[in-house]
Amino acid sequence: MARAKFERTKPHVNVGTIGHVDHGKTTLTAAITTTLAALGQATAKRYDEIDAAPEEKARGITINTAHVEYQTANRHYAHVDCPGHADYVKNMITGAAQMDGAILVVSAADGPMPQTREHILLARQVGVPSLVVFLNKADMVDDPELLELVELEVRELLSKYDFPGDDVPIIRGSALKALERMTANPKTQRGEDPWVDKIYELMDAVDSYIPTPERDVDKPFLMAVEDVFSITGRGTVATGRIERGRIKVGETVELVGLRETRSTTVTGLEMFQKTLDEGIAGDNVGVLLRGIQKNEVERGMVLAKPKTITPHTNFESEVYVLKKEEGGRHTPFFAGYRPQFYVRTTDVTGTISSFTADDGSQPEMVMPGDRVKMTVELIQPIAIEQGMRFAIREGGRTVGAGVVSKILK
């Protein structure tokens, strides 16, 4: 059967549900799809279809994630929901599903719980730009003052982690009530049921409050060098996949990382053995560089628009350490551990100088399965920026995955 063509008529946004276990993330995901299905803008998904998420591998780590898609009048959404808490942590750190925004689900009956806090913190550290809150199970709370209190508590928590707590839209509703109504009458439209209306209200907030992300092609040019070869009489060619932005023949680029940064001019572009006028994000290209010798470029450097990325050696990061069952280490490691950090296309040795747990304490050691903040010093400078993902490897196997939360030097 021929594949249906993906029609790009509306802007595309990636969202996800986050929040404490059993506060209703998966029920809400089901409620959104069934509600929008009445308009023909989604395929209704049952709770158990979302909950039985298939396993996926991202950077060697197994994650259970369910992906659903739906549309509103304004946008096309890809929505990710993870069944287990550990899956969220891994998903957010490895960037298996990059979220442009998230729906934080908080049970009105319980208020914010430890994982609510942890997911907000993670969202902040891995760079989820904006959150919308769904105060779920509002049907179980009779006292309006109690709802006010929970809402206030959520706003304070958001502010604590540098989200604009006063401005974040908070919608009160009941995913289960909406889902029950839609299941009883799948044609229910807006205005016909107060609980279903809350789902529409939530989607209005997601539509208007979560900004449309800048597309990769509109960002400044960056390509990690994968391979280098020389063409007699023409010069040196660096090949790789363009991570973001666009590049034309005649433009100036910088070679960043491993050595002194230097600039050069692009004198030719090729893709699939054909010449190219312009390369854009996602293309695998060969870039011919003026005045650069083959021994001056190596895998692990990046080609970038001048002054958009700089080389660094010291950074703070959020890291998930793989369990033994995931192919990780069998034993803990201590400060001073020197693994390889796999960034974009290359391994660089680095020393882990210190660890910090969520509560601010500095543990002696890190166990497989832990999530921890670590400070790293690389032996060579490479192009690093906040929000960048990396893997930690030892003897060719992945032992951890991380994201840069702060550049130190």
Swiss-Prot record:
The keyword Acyltransferase is annotated on this UniProt entry: no
Residues annotated for GTP binding in this entry: 19-26, 81-85, 136-139
A GO MF label: translation elongation factor activity
Keywords carried by this UniProt record: Cytoplasm, Elongation factor, GTP-binding, Hydrolase, Magnesium, Metal-binding, Nucleotide-binding, Protein biosynthesis
Region of interest (G3), residue spans: 81-84
Region (G1): 19-26
Region (G5): 174-176
Enzymatic reactions: GTP + H2O = GDP + phosphate + H(+)
Any one annotated GO CC term: cytosol
Cellular compartments annotated: Cytoplasm
SUPFAM superfamilies: EF-Tu/eEF-1alpha/eIF2-gamma C-terminal domain (SSF50465), P-loop containing nucleoside triphosphate hydrolases (SSF52540), Translation proteins (SSF50447)
Region of interest: G2: 60-64
Region described as G4: 136-139
Domain tr-type G: 10-214
Entry binding sites for Mg(2+): T26
Family note: Belongs to the TRAFAC class translation factor GTPase superfamily. Classic translation factor GTPase family. EF-Tu/EF-1A subfamily.
Quaternary structure note: Monomer.
Record's function text: GTP hydrolase that promotes the GTP-dependent binding of aminoacyl-tRNA to the A-site of ribosomes during protein biosynthesis.
Protein name in the entry: Elongation factor Tu
Source organism: Synechococcus sp. (strain JA-2-3B'a(2-13))
